[in-house]
């Protein structure tokens, strides 16, 4: 359970981790909204801006904002490592008793942070999710796909996964340390955080339109996120492949019985079309099964390599440069079989 931490001088009560990639257009609005909220807390805080290898003026603007905002800490990654890896970099280096993860586009309102912090303190919660009140602003396609995605998450990680909760959440120091101890290389925090089982609550909010710039989560990346969610938390696709193979075997067995019965009764069994259809069907099933197996093998391959999820080019907190993330511990049983 979360421990109460006061706001005495020199104590960082809250860290706000913000992954960003090419967010020069959204940064001014973010700073203008976030700083007054945090200054009004009356407690020590830091803002950990993780520049995920941006190619625009994001780094330049962050340096300029930092001149007048000493609580702003900038971590620059050497290359674009992806949103979840950038979030990992921020969580690894945040020092606050509580840590809030926030996107840079202001769609998740920073004004809800005090409410999340108050809820965690009052009820002794380790996790507070920001949950969308509704999705009326989304297109019909987005609502349909999002609904399916969250139903999938709840099947994989259980009912503890709140519907319509993204990466806007508050974590206690205990929850952050538990996440840092996990060996997972390819992380999906929407599943990892509920899986930990810490006491949690929710703060509902209306999601706003993007303040500026373009989304960094187009359809392709959303599909990849869904695939990582499935293969990272469940062996269900492999079981599905087994059932597909069994179903195809039953169909082929039925066709075989039908063919031999026809020959036994002296009937000519026309079958070039049906035979070709069966061959194509079986081939398609095999390719799907091989593809599913390949996804899992690729995850094992990545885990065995144990490469850092990100490389830090610089960190304004200590002037660090060229620092990889600490390799995640890989259990021996994952890399080789016991004799």
Which positions does each model-derived feature cover?
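Structured catalytic core of nucleotide-sugar glycosyltransferases
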Residues: 1-139
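Acceptor/aglycone-binding surface of glycosyltransferases and processive sugar-polymer synthases
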Residues: 75-79, 83-93, 98, 107-192, ...
